[in-house]
């Protein structure tokens, strides 16, 4: 595969600029589970059912598995999502399996297309032995003699638990007290905002991190500096790395003029461009400082990463290349890109605000 020279973002959960993406929020729940709920998960044996088919494109059955210890305590995992495939909903999914001669029957559930989750069975929390808890575990701690547990709602599934065969509902977003156990089931939407820091829960938007004992939250503000920035098409420039645009089409050149003091007045500003071309490169003078392979028609650039260049010269040059019917234009795109277009426009220039929680 062909790759950019600079931009190795690859749609990671944490972007190259440190922003937490939506799938990063989802992945954080898994990380918290491993670090703050069950540190022994990796020692549990994985079990898989006999598949109806070995065809990787077969979406007629639910992909699922179990991880369990020798005592039959573990987790049921289910997934109705695979990139490039379109699953249907699964109705009345019933699961039964045997571990160490003991048969375990899990509750019947409906699994929505696109859903991915897991929940525990035969698990002890505090002094309570649960048959199962139909919610995804995230974190637990001890407080005032109680085991306090945080769960996330499994997408599209009403949370409940079973103790000695007796089923009881679990309320969302409030305490469920069962003997010496407190269970909080966070709604599916709110769970994406959940953070667990030093044994305390936080619900925060944006990118959250700790620095010298402080909890900081970075968010894109409503302050838009777009009208203070100009993007104009300009004449051809002699610049290096032309081949790495991987297009046989005609190049286009843009001049991006930024306010000279933009990074003295603001810690960071995120530029968002609408882009219909194949690839682009950004230059400060003759030095390439950024590039982008078009995966979603949204070119993002956080200015703080380029502070040393902007302070020397607040004008940057952007060179674009179009997608063509024939030629090299075979780089990785997840969306349809129009042929022969170099269209680039500045959609917004939002100030990034950092606040202590």
What are these regions (language model features)?
Residues 326-357:
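Exposed low-complexity, polar/acidic, P/S/T/G-rich flexible segments that act as propeptides
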Residues 1-215, 349:
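Carbohydrate-binding surfaces of carbohydrate-active enzymes
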Residues 227-254:
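Edge strands and adjacent loops of beta-rich recognition modules
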Residues 290-298:
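A short acidic/small-residue loop/turn micro-motif
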Residues 248-261, 299-301:
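Short beta-strands within extracellular/lumenal beta-sheet-rich domains
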Residues 119-120, 256, 299-308:
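Exposed aromatic-hydrophobic patches
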Residues 262-285, 292-293, 318:
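Aromatic-lined ligand-binding clefts that engage carbohydrates, nucleic acids, or primary amines
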Residues 317-325:
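Short beta-strand-plus-loop segments that form exposed binding edges in beta-rich domains
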